[in-house]
UniProtKB/Swiss-Prot annotation:
[4Fe-4S] cluster binds at C23, C26, C30, C70. This is Nitrate reductase. It comes from Synechococcus elongatus (strain ATCC 33912 / PCC 7942 / FACHB-805) (Anacystis nidulans R2). The keyword Oxidoreductase applies. Keywords: 4Fe-4S, Iron, Iron-sulfur, Metal-binding, Molybdenum, Nitrate assimilation, Oxidoreductase.
Length: 729
């Protein structure tokens, strides 16, 4: 055993001094230090309403962020006391007002409804929809309750909307989920290819780290995006491709790299399978055809290939622009194929690196937090995987269903079909974030019984809930989170939760106990201690970690098997090029270009894409309550190219109506060359609480990748026309 005494002392659960924690927003996973409102010799720090607030600063000792922090992280403490749900509330009908009730009554009603639903609908009449905002302990207890004890795999999360295509792609190509690269590779790469990610706004601290080096020279940046985002503005090469043409582009780059001879033949022969199949596919993507499919110039394609081929080490980053597509898995595997072609994986400065959107989406993947997964990167369809988990959980063989559960959108379809009788939503806001949101809202309204477990009240989803459960949130509960580079951080509680709010895992465990199962955990550390044993021997082995070790030694990357020594050095996967398939070989996974599910036509001639802004987060449940961020981004808008603005007689700031086959919205126009002709952009953060007719997802459709189940939120066909009033942007 290693000696923990050389590390920092254990941090107590409730702090009277500076506390170390993790930012609860994006997947970069920045370390934060929270300073109490009252300090000796200083006036108490208060917000505009006079409430004492903790001051937030970057943790310089955190290996992932090195003391940097963005506006969201810096202001997060301003949101924790506003509009909180403090007590359980119930109403028998959606037409009734909520009434405050006790926890005993709330849990009795919840458990009675679960049992009644099982009797009336069967086990699969129950659905649970969670979130990448969960801590790992929350995720794990939910999996044990739903998939183990209740016997249904109908547990999905909002990670289905952002990361499931990356999960599928890694699994297909490398044999398992898990990004092989780390943040240090940004410091080492000679060429960085960013596909479908506005990293500068959506993962700003990570981009700032690379940008410092990029300014010094010696590394080239290629950005693939239909918009000229702040990320693309500083690129050495911006490829403004047609929405949905990523597979064609990546296949075309493969054609060029192969013709240039940038092929590692020994590696391909000894460490991979499927190369000949890939070669047969990319033969259909010579430069001229690729240019036609993508809308790019042949010269741009050749330059991109030259920049990659001339790099000794090249790294790729991707995010929602790749994943949120009917070809999400195909796009990601097409990118991984290029790394296999060039042996740029498992080595410093290279690798295919997906950026998670949420702070613990990675932890959710490790714990099995999607409808087809089990803890430890296992799958419900694998008999041995089910048996492994049943044994660890002390359940009879056959307790876990072999049938993958309903994905997020399939839950909506289940409500429409009358097949779902009980829906439990936690830490997310599907009444804004799901595609075709008006249809989703209508389905939610049909739910016989919906539980909403959240820290805030109201949210847009409150409208569709019967039972509200108050949840403790960031700063109020202790637990762990895993960021995009597989680094696990202990997030210590340093504030008391308001009212009667409870940690999510405690709520799940109490429901399990009331239903007759053993959920006897003394604290979150005990939950984590059980969970990490489920990962022993798996690619995501965390069995050597504990809350105590993380508190004393600081954040650690996995794999971290039992007996491993703590370190701040970076870890990569597949360093010996032995991949997670049984034979140790990676797989080329080629696909043909298909385009978007809903291409533009005469009636709907434009393509709408949606995305994030720098300051806001998801549906504004937190950031909408922070003055500084609202001043930074006061309203929704639509970006339109000057050519299209002239065509439709639209001027800067004018109100416009955008319509799709599903709905419409009204936005002020922002006329800019940052968007490609024929394409519109609307930010996705505004729901009914924050604007009138500004829901981006009223326009989007639910067509999804057939492999990952991730909806194509990034492209739908729309029409636009000028309205009468004007706005100030």
């Amino acid at each position: 055993m290693f000696d923990l005494s050389k590390f920092l002392p254990v941090i107590t659960p409730l702090m009277i001094d500076t506390a170390k924690t993790l930012c609860p927003y994006c997947g970069v996973g920045c370390g934060l230090e929270a300073v109490p409102p009252a300090q000796p010799g200083r006036a108490t720090v208060r917000d505009r309403e006079g409430t004492p607030i903790w001051q937030i600063r970057g943790d310089r000792q955190h290996p992932s962020s090195q003391g940097m922090v963005c506006v969201k992280g810096a202001t997060v403490a301003e949101s924790v006391s506003k509009s909180r749900l403090k007590y359980p509330m119930f109403r028998a009908s959606l037409d009734d007002p909520f009434t405050e009730i006790s926890w005993d009554e709330a849990l009795d009603r919840l458990c009675d409804r679960i049992q009644q639903t099982q009797a009336d609908y069967g086990k699969d009449g129950i659905c649970f929809y969670g979130s990448g905002q969960f801590q790992t302990e929350d995720y794990y207890i939910a999996q044990k309750l739903v998939k183990g004890c209740l016997g249904t795999n109908n547990f999905d999360t909002n990670s289905r909307l952002c990361m499931s295509s990356a999960v599928s792609a890694y699994s297909l190509c490398l044999g398992s989920d898990g990004p092989p690269a780390c943040y240090e590779d940004l410091d080492l790469a000679d060429c960085l290819l960013i596909v479908g990610s506005n990293t500068a706004e959506c993962h700003p601290i990570l981009f700032n780290r690379y940008r410092k080096r990029h300014k010094q020279g010696g590394t080239n940046l290629i950005v693939v995006d239909p918009r000229c985002t702040p990320t693309a503005e500083v690129a050495d090469l911006h490829l403004a491709l047609k929405p949905g043409s990523d597979v064609a582009l990546l296949n075309g780059l493969g054609w060029l790299l192969y013709q240039m001879g940038y092929v590692k033949k020994d590696f391909i022969a000894n460490q991979t399978e499927g190369f000949e199949d890939w070669l047969a596919i990319i033969e259909d993507y010579p430069p001229q055809r690729t240019a036609e499919l993508t809308g790019l110039a042949v010269a741009e394609l050749v330059r991109a290939a030259d920049l990659i081929a001339s790099a000794q080490r090249w790294l790729s980053l991707w995010s929602m622009g790749v994943n949120q597509s009917i070809q999400g898995t195909a796009k990601a595997t097409s990118l991984i194929n290029l790394h296999l072609l060039t042996r740029q994986i498992g080595l410093p400065g290279c690798g295919p690196f997906s950026l998670t959107g949420q702070p613990n989406a990675m932890g959710g993947r490790e714990t099995g937090g999607l409808a087809h997964l089990l803890p430890g990167y296992r799958k419900v369809i694998d008999p041995q995987h089910r048996a492994d988990v049943e044994t660890i959980w002390g359940l009879p063989m056959g307790s876990i269903s072999p049938q993958p559960g309903r994905t997020a959108w399939q839950m909506i379809e289940g409500l429409e079909q009358g097949a779902v009788g009980f829906l439990w939503v936690a830490a997310t806001n599907p009444a804004v974030s799901l595609p075709d949101v008006k249809r989703a809202q209508a389905a939610l309204k049909r739910s016989p019984f919906t539980v909403l477990q959240d820290a805030y009240h109201p949210t847009e989803t409150t409208t569709y809930a019967h039972l509200l459960l108050p949840a403790a949130q960031w700063s109020e509960k202790t637990g762990t989170m895993t960021n995009s580079e597989r680094r696990v951080t202990l997030c210590q509680a340093f504030r008391q939760p308001p009212g009667e709010a409870r940690a999510d895992w405690q709520i799940f465990a109490e429901v399990g106990r009331r239903l007759g199962f053993a959920f006897d955990y003394t604290d979150a550390a005990a939950v984590f201690a059980e969970y990490v044993q489920v990962t022993a021997g798996r690619l995501c082995d965390l069995s050597g970690l504990s809350h105590e070790l993380l508190a004393q030694a600081g954040p650690q990357q996995w794999p971290f098997p039992a007996g491993a020594e703590p370190t701040t050095e970076s870890k990569r996967l597949y360093t010996k090029h032995h991949f997670a398939y049984a034979d140790g070989r990676a797989r080329f996974q080629p696909f043909h270009h298909l385009g978007v599910a809903e291409p533009p036509d005469d009636r709907y001639p434009l393509v709408l894409t949606v995305g994030r802004l720098y300051g806001h987060w998801h549906t504004q449940t937190r950031t909408g309550r922070i003055d500084k961020i609202n001043k930074l981004h006061p309203s929704a808008f639509v970006e339109i190219h000057p050519r299209d603005a002239d065509r439709y007689n639209i001027s800067e700031g004018q109100a416009v109506v955008i319509r799709s086959r599903r709905g419409e919205g009204c936005f002020p126009a922002k006329v800019t060359t940052a968007i490609s002709p024929g394409v519109l952009f609307v930010p996705m953060h505004w729901g009914a609480l924050w604007g009138d007719r500004t829901e981006a997802n009223a326009l989007t459709h639910p067509a999804a990748c057939p492999i990952s189940g991730e909806p194509e939120l990034k492209a739908c066909a729309v029409q636009i026309e000028a309205a009468s009033s004007t706005f100030t942007i």
